[in-house]
Amino acid sequence: MSILALVEDRPTPKEVYNWKIYLLAAVASFTSCMIGYDSAFIGTTLALSSFREEFGFSTMSKTAVNLVSANIVSCYQAGAFFGAFFAYPIGHFWGRKWGLLFAGTIFTLGAGLMLGANGDRGLGLLYGGRVLAGLGVGAGSNITPIYISEMAPPSIRGRLVGVYELGWQIGGLVGFWINYGVSETLAPSHKQWIIPFAVQLIPSGLLLIGAVFLKESPRWLFSRGRREDAIKNLCWIRQLPADHIYMIEEIGAVDQALEEQRTTIGLGFWKPFKAAGTNKKVMYRLFLGSMLFFWQNGSGINAINYYSPTVFKSIGLHGANTSMFSTGIFGVVKTVVTFVWLLYLIDRVGRRLLLLIGAAGAAVCLLIVGAYIKIADPASNPTQEMTGGGIAAMFFFYLYTVFYTPSWNGTPWVMNSEMFEPNMRSLAQACAAASNWLWNFLISRFTPQMFAKMEYGVWFFFASLMLLSIVFVFFLVPETKGIPLESMDVLFESKPIWRAHATVLAKLREDEEQFRHDIEESGYSKTGEQQVEHVSEDLPKV
């Protein structure tokens, strides 16, 4: 079987897997490039001697430096927390496209504000810009996964939402290496540390340009009663005429799902809030979505992303450039493994099994690194060169990255984008994204203090959380690969959880065979014409 072989819930025409759907996902994923770059560059920028000298870090106590560094990093997450919620009304009333434009605009303003900071003006502009940039990425982290999942065919939905994760890793790769580059090529100066801040404008500028040409989500258009526009956009994205049986099935499934919503949750702005507080099924899925991000942050990945020099120093690496180089290798490993996850694992292996395997492997690696630090205590016993034990610890650190990246890094984003009804999706994604940024904030705010007080215990702490996540996923999280968005209710109601996917997929295939049989019996062409007669004049020629 080919590495790109797909698992389909029904026969899918080859036209559906076209370049347009990948292009739309790629353009929308410039939001994740912004997030990835911002998450990666800030830690090593704060470690640059030019930055520390300009803002007087050398005159501060170690405790004060840790506090200021934590504040600079964490105010970004605080902004992102609120940005995730601000995106909900924009996405609901004005659509996914305008939500992406809003995210790009706010982020660009924040990035521009940061460029005004210097030693004379102090850190105020940096704090303000980080908060604004956080608002932008919080909004983007809400809107982008929804936009992509609503356009994607079920068989490649994981792969397309995975493009969002790939953008995150590409941005991170640039962010991890840029400070190594400026430290090697530029003398310590204002220019040396301001360049990494200026590069933030590149992904946000590309997003603003590209989003202008994006097609609005057909499912959002259906939910707003703009049926003709919805079918027109869906035909453009699928590259199929509206009377094709695949289109009839998809439009029928969306209509049926919207009708069920009208009679259960409702389609108004406030209806999802009511459901979130009273509907046990919705509350349960919100709990699952938020907890996935709790366990993701419990892996310790963001402690590494934001404070990689501190992390590598705890293992025994010394020297700013050496830490930056090791951080760059960390970024390369994450990016390469993300490609494997995107092309092969997410839609072939699935979400649930990846989470289980990734948590087990990552936990073992973290325990080994923690045990080495406990025994060797490299911080108290520094050496000119790394010992054999230190090299082994670095190996298991990178092996941890190999286990974590194709499992917990992007999979929670994929699952949260697909497991809610259309009218709940914006609010649910806002809650999920906000929970991610809340846990992210706590990790980024207290990591320096944790390493100062707990030392090797930090590694054991994160390993313990990874082990607990295995129990959570096994008993509570169903597999969602290949299941249409409109069938998620049935999936989450199926028991036991570990057999739900096979049960629902078998039922979908049975219903598909019956549907096609009924269509053929009633006259396929006639049925197709009746389904789309009222919009045929507005359809594009594809």
From Swiss-Prot:
Entry protein name: Probable quinate permease
Protein's job: Integral membrane transporter that imports quinic acid to be catabolized as a carbon source.
Residue ranges of the TM segments: 23-43, 75-95, 98-118, 131-151, 160-180, 194-214, 286-306, 326-346, 353-373, 388-408, 457-477
Residue spans, topological domain Cytoplasmic: 1-22, 96-97, 152-159, 215-285, 347-352, 409-456
Gene: qutD
Stretches in topological domain Extracellular: 44-74, 119-130, 181-193, 307-325, 374-387, 478-542
Complex formation: Interacts with creB.
Species annotation: Aspergillus fumigatus (strain ATCC MYA-4609 / CBS 101355 / FGSC A1100 / Af293)
Start and end residues of each stretch annotated as Disordered: 523-542
Keywords in alphabetical order: Cell membrane, Membrane, Quinate metabolism, Transmembrane, Transmembrane helix, Transport, Ubl conjugation
GO cellular component terms, A-Z: membrane; plasma membrane
Topology within the bilayer: Multi-pass membrane protein
